[in-house]
Amino acid sequence: MPKFAANLSFLFAEVPFPERFNRAAAAGFTGVEYLFPYEYPASEIAEWLRANDLEQVLFNLSAGDWAAGERGLACLPHRQGDFAESVEQALGYAMVLDCGRVHCLAGLSPKGTSSGARLAGVSEAELEATYVANLQFAADRFATIGATVMIEPINSRIDMPGYWLDDVGKGFRLLEAVDRSNVKLQYDIYHAQIIAGDLARTLEANIHRIGHIQIADNPGRHEPGTGEINYPFLFDLLDRLGYDGWIGCEYRPLTTTEASLGWLPK
């Protein structure tokens, strides 16, 4: 059975962030992930992990100015300096937290966004070339500590309008373009269901290129069992395929976090 990590940006939101580590451990989780750690010193987070015997499974590189609507920097030609700084920042946290995976957000396509005016005339080819170069830089930096960089297709229809990497097939093609052994696809089953479906065949054909999995049901992005996705079947499939990585529980509990955990395999 796969290993499940609590996403502390979504789960145990009933309490302040530092207390969520204790709640996750008490609920039986042995690993945690979250969006961003940068509001807290890495040494403090490391102590919360140690105190609760938890593994830091994954976190994101900085997305830029999240409050202003930015959702990553990797595809934006005018932000390459900021991207490089975000890599160094995340590298420092990953070393202190002993974290072997980081997710690199692609960013929003300039078309129709506040940055569009500054990028008028920038082609899709230029965006992709910037993204590939940035991912290669990040991969080479994280290789120095034995860590893997994740790229995640995120649906632009419901959750993140304008997101540049919004197609699963595009994600696999970009892996080939980046051509680094420590860059893998982060396969979020919720997003993948909205983008294209065909979950089982995608997993079967590409499990060797998938380095992390996240889950939520659809519609609603709530816990497994509240929507249309057959998670017991998919968990069995992952076992048959030999997937030994983590599965991040990145869902919004329908009621409380504790009440949402009944789906967890015993």
Language-model regions: role of each:
Residues 73-184:
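Active-site acidic/histidine proton-transfer and metal-coordination neighborhood
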Residues 33, 57-60, 103, 150, ...:
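Conserved beta-strand positions in the central sheet of alpha/beta enzyme cores
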Residues 44-53, 134-142, 202, 233-237:
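Catalytic-core regions built around general acid/base machinery
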Residues 7-8, 31-33, 76-78, 122-126, ...:
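Short, contiguous strand/loop micro-motifs
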